[in-house]
Amino acid sequence: MYYYKFWYFRPNKAIAQLIKGKWISRTDKYVSARENYFYGNIPKVLPKNVILLGEEPINKVLSKEYKYFLPKDKAIEQISYLHKVGNIIVRKTKIKVKGLPNLDLMKEAAKHFIGKKDFTNFTIEREAKNPLCTIIKFDIEERKDYYVFSIVGDRFLYHMVRKIISFIVSVGYKIYPLEYIDLVFKERLNPKPKDADPKFLWLWKINKT
């Protein structure tokens, strides 16, 4: 089956609201896409910042890759103040943070997300009916003015990537202890991580046959 291939930048609505039909990935408002695929009727006039790149055949989607380009001066804004995991209190009070997150802590935290996990803590309630997802790759790179988070998975739940980013940054600022990280896939986080800013998130690649 042939799909239309699109590029778009920070749309002012979820892409499925702007162009109705079957999308391979239903990205949120302000989330950009280097490539996304659509099956259906294309409107005569495309929304602003949405570009049709062509057509490609798709038999099966193997995985999706997202990249989050986090400016260093926006890192603190992505923090989630996490209080409990299960019955364990991980932070009694808010702490003042400054500077940049610890890159080594963030990289170590990212390793724990690889594999088939229960991502109930990283989505909204209505998406938690089937919370099992497999993360194939999760890398973090430091550039001069920003960090690049690259995450590849077989599927992603609603808001999942943005909540993961907020959580990882919180680990980098020592808000959430690394020693309790595996519990987030077994016990309930209270509160759940907030959604990191969608403007820095890109759907980067659809791996397909």
From Swiss-Prot:
Ribosomal protein as UniProt keyword: no
Domain of life according to the entry: Archaea
Record: active site: D28
Coiled coil: none
PANTHER family per UniProt: PSEUDOURIDYLATE SYNTHASE, TRNA PSEUDOURIDINE(38_39) SYNTHASE
Purpose: Formation of pseudouridine at positions 38, 39 and 40 in the anticodon stem and loop of transfer RNAs.
Protein name, per record: tRNA pseudouridine synthase A
Taxon lineage: Archaea, Nanobdellota, Candidatus Nanoarchaeia, Nanoarchaeales, Nanoarchaeaceae
